[in-house]
């Protein structure tokens, strides 16, 4: 596995929050080396403290010793009071700042200080509580405006999807979509809930309600891995459809196919079936509080349960049947259990005509008797024999 680093940082906009008091946070889309994209929220005061620490770590590059050596960009200090106008006008500065940082040598652009600052925190995953009196106000950067998301840090282009059916949000953290609505997907969570934006709205939408505009097949779905990855169930689930599997909490299983809609194909012995990825945890890892908050939303609906789905594509997305999964899984397990074939030094190889054989050694002739020597050998040999006797 290669080193962890950040490919791109894009500023999506900012939020005006009212808990515990009124303040503003900036919303960043961070693309990591494994092409995963995460949304994080940071206050400007946090960003400025990060900037000061970065200058202390690299005083030469910060121009603290010689001004002409400065390569770390300048960042103005926060004001005593930051209003909405200041938060909005500062977006251009932040865009240029992080764009410059990502273009610096790797000892700066990939330093642990930068990576740790943009790692997902529990607060980044903690969605607003439906019981809050006043919800956060979100101000997204216009796609055709000055701070185009695609121009912030290189080739970050939000993928566009279309809703195949009406979906009514179940909480304030989700987003309602109608059939035919076009949304930009900001984050694809393994849980099957995707964070989307549509004009000035944003929220979580089940991936099963969305289809790519270009083709009916989800190209990002990986191929099945019949070797399996060990996972443990952290929540019981009773199968509803025939191709699903029922499991209790704490059962050890193997994941053989991870699908983006949040319904993974798992294997328990020789049995395979769909199971919600939200109720799974990698074996040997502890579940975090942030993951508990995501899983509390519940498993997303499956595509097969959506009524009146209207796709713009003539052919539907291809999905393997459970019979195919089961057959391929059994074949793989049989091959894994089968003993290895004997090597070239095995006893069977001596019957193989293609195997090279060693040349036989000549037999040692018996020693001739004394009478034979006296009758057939030379006079010299006879004298030696006579003297020896």
UniProtKB/Swiss-Prot annotation:
<dbReference type="InterPro" id="IPR001683">
    <property type="entry name" value="PX_dom"/>
</dbReference>
<feature type="domain" description="PX">
    <location>
        <begin position="4"/>
        <end position="125"/>
    </location>
</feature>
<dbReference type="InterPro" id="IPR001655">
    <property type="entry name" value="P47PHOX"/>
</dbReference>
<dbReference type="GO" id="GO:0006968">
    <property type="term" value="P:cellular defense response"/>
</dbReference>
<dbReference type="Pfam" id="PF08944">
    <property type="entry name" value="p47_phox_C"/>
</dbReference>
<feature type="modified residue" description="Phosphoserine">
    <location>
        <position position="349"/>
    </location>
</feature>
<dbReference type="InterPro" id="IPR036028">
    <property type="entry name" value="SH3-like_dom_sf"/>
</dbReference>
<dbReference type="InterPro" id="IPR036871">
    <property type="entry name" value="PX_dom_sf"/>
</dbReference>
<feature type="modified residue" description="Phosphoserine">
    <location>
        <position position="346"/>
    </location>
</feature>
<feature type="modified residue" description="Phosphoserine">
    <location>
        <position position="329"/>
    </location>
</feature>
<dbReference type="GO" id="GO:0050665">
    <property type="term" value="P:hydrogen peroxide biosynthetic process"/>
</dbReference>
<dbReference type="GO" id="GO:0070946">
    <property type="term" value="P:neutrophil-mediated killing of gram-positive bacterium"/>
</dbReference>
<protein>
    <recommendedName>
        <fullName>Neutrophil cytosolic factor 1</fullName>
    </recommendedName>
</protein>
<dbReference type="Pfam" id="PF16621">
    <property type="entry name" value="NCF1_PBR_AIR"/>
</dbReference>
<dbReference type="InterPro" id="IPR001452">
    <property type="entry name" value="SH3_domain"/>
</dbReference>
<dbReference type="GO" id="GO:0009617">
    <property type="term" value="P:response to bacterium"/>
</dbReference>
<dbReference type="InterPro" id="IPR032136">
    <property type="entry name" value="NCF1_PBR/AIR"/>
</dbReference>
<dbReference type="GO" id="GO:0043025">
    <property type="term" value="C:neuronal cell body"/>
</dbReference>
<dbReference type="GO" id="GO:0017124">
    <property type="term" value="F:SH3 domain binding"/>
</dbReference>
<dbReference type="GO" id="GO:0070947">
    <property type="term" value="P:neutrophil-mediated killing of fungus"/>
</dbReference>
<dbReference type="GO" id="GO:0060264">
    <property type="term" value="P:regulation of respiratory burst involved in inflammatory response"/>
</dbReference>
<dbReference type="Pfam" id="PF00787">
    <property type="entry name" value="PX"/>
</dbReference>
<feature type="domain" description="SH3 1">
    <location>
        <begin position="156"/>
        <end position="215"/>
    </location>
</feature>
<dbReference type="GO" id="GO:0016020">
    <property type="term" value="C:membrane"/>
</dbReference>
<keyword id="KW-0963">Cytoplasm</keyword>
<dbReference type="GO" id="GO:0042742">
    <property type="term" value="P:defense response to bacterium"/>
</dbReference>
<comment type="function">
    <text>Subunit of the phagocyte NADPH oxidase complex that mediates the transfer of electrons from cytosolic NADPH to O2 to produce the superoxide anion (O2(-)). In the activated complex, electrons are first transferred from NADPH to flavin adenine dinucleotide (FAD) and subsequently transferred via two heme molecules to molecular oxygen, producing superoxide through an outer-sphere reaction.</text>
</comment>
<dbReference type="InterPro" id="IPR015039">
    <property type="entry name" value="NCF1_C"/>
</dbReference>
<dbReference type="GO" id="GO:0042554">
    <property type="term" value="P:superoxide anion generation"/>
</dbReference>
<dbReference type="InterPro" id="IPR035756">
    <property type="entry name" value="NCF1_SH3_1"/>
</dbReference>
<comment type="subunit">
    <text>Component of the phagocyte NADPH oxidase complex composed of an obligatory core heterodimer formed by the membrane proteins CYBA and CYBB and at least the three cytosolic regulatory subunits NCF1/p47-phox, NCF2/p67-phox, and the small GTPase RAC1 or RAC2. Part of a cytosolic complex composed at least by NCF1, NCF2 and NCF4. Interacts (via C-terminus) with NCF2 (via the C-terminal SH3 domain). Interacts with NCF4. Interacts with CYBB. Interacts (via the second SH3 domain) with CYBA; interaction is phosphorylation-dependent. Interacts with NOXA1. Interacts with ADAM15. Interacts with TRAF4.</text>
</comment>
<feature type="domain" description="SH3 2">
    <location>
        <begin position="226"/>
        <end position="285"/>
    </location>
</feature>
<dbReference type="GO" id="GO:0035091">
    <property type="term" value="F:phosphatidylinositol binding"/>
</dbReference>
<dbReference type="GO" id="GO:0050673">
    <property type="term" value="P:epithelial cell proliferation"/>
</dbReference>
<keyword id="KW-0728">SH3 domain</keyword>
<dbReference type="GO" id="GO:0005886">
    <property type="term" value="C:plasma membrane"/>
</dbReference>
<dbReference type="GO" id="GO:0030425">
    <property type="term" value="C:dendrite"/>
</dbReference>
<dbReference type="GO" id="GO:0050832">
    <property type="term" value="P:defense response to fungus"/>
</dbReference>
<dbReference type="InterPro" id="IPR051228">
    <property type="entry name" value="NADPH_Oxidase/PX-Domain"/>
</dbReference>
<dbReference type="GO" id="GO:0071394">
    <property type="term" value="P:cellular response to testosterone stimulus"/>
</dbReference>
<dbReference type="GO" id="GO:0006691">
    <property type="term" value="P:leukotriene metabolic process"/>
</dbReference>
<dbReference type="GO" id="GO:0006954">
    <property type="term" value="P:inflammatory response"/>
</dbReference>
């Amino acid at each position: 596995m290669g080193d962890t680093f950040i490919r791109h940082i894009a500023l999506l906009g900012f939020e005006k929050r009212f808990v515990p008091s009124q303040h503003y946070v900036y919303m960043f889309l961070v693309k990591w080396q494994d092409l995963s994209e995460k949304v994080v929220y940071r206050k400007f005061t946090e960003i400025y403290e990060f900037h000061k620490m970065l200058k202390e770590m690299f005083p030469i590059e910060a121009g603290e010793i010689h001004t002409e050596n400065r390569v770390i960009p300048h960042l103005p200090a926060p004001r005593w009071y930051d209003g909405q106008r200041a938060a909005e006008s500062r977006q251009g500065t932040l865009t240029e700042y992080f764009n410059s940082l990502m273009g610096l040598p790797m000892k700066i652009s990939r330093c642990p200080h930068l990576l740790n600052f943009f790692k997902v925190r529990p607060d980044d995953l903690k969605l607003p509580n439906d019981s809050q009196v006043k919800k956060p106000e979100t101000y997204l950067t216009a796609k055709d405006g000055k701070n185009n998301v695609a121009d912030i840090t290189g080739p970050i282009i939000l993928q566009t999807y279309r809703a195949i059916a009406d979906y009514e949000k179940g909480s304030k953290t989700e987003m309602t979509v109608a059939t035919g609505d076009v949304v930009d997907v900001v984050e694809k969570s393994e849980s099957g809930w995707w964070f989307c934006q549509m004009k000035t709205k944003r929220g979580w939408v089940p991936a099963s309600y969305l289809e790519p505009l270009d083709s009916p097949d989800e190209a990002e779905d990986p191929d099945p891995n019949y070797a399996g990855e060990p996972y443990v169930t952290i929540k019981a689930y009773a199968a509803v459809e025939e191709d699903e599997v029922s499991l209790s909490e704490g059962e050890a299983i193997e994941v053989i196919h991870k699908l983006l809609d949040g319904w993974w194909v798992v294997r328990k012995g020789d049995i395979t079936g769909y199971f919600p990825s939200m109720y799974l945890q990698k074996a040997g890892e502890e579940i975090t509080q942030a993951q508990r908050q995501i899983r509390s939303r519940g498993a997303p609906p499956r595509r097969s349960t959506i009524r009146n789905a209207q796709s713009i594509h003539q052919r539907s997305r291809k999905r393997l049947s459970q019979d195919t999964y089961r057959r391929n899984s059994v074949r793989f397990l049989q091959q894994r259990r089968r003993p290895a074939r004997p090597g070239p030094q095995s006893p069977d190889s001596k019957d193989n005509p293609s195997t090279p054989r060693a040349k036989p050694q000549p037999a040692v002739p018996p020693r001739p008797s004394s009478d034979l020597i006296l009758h057939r050998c030379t006079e010299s040999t006879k004298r030696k024999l006579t003297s020896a006797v």
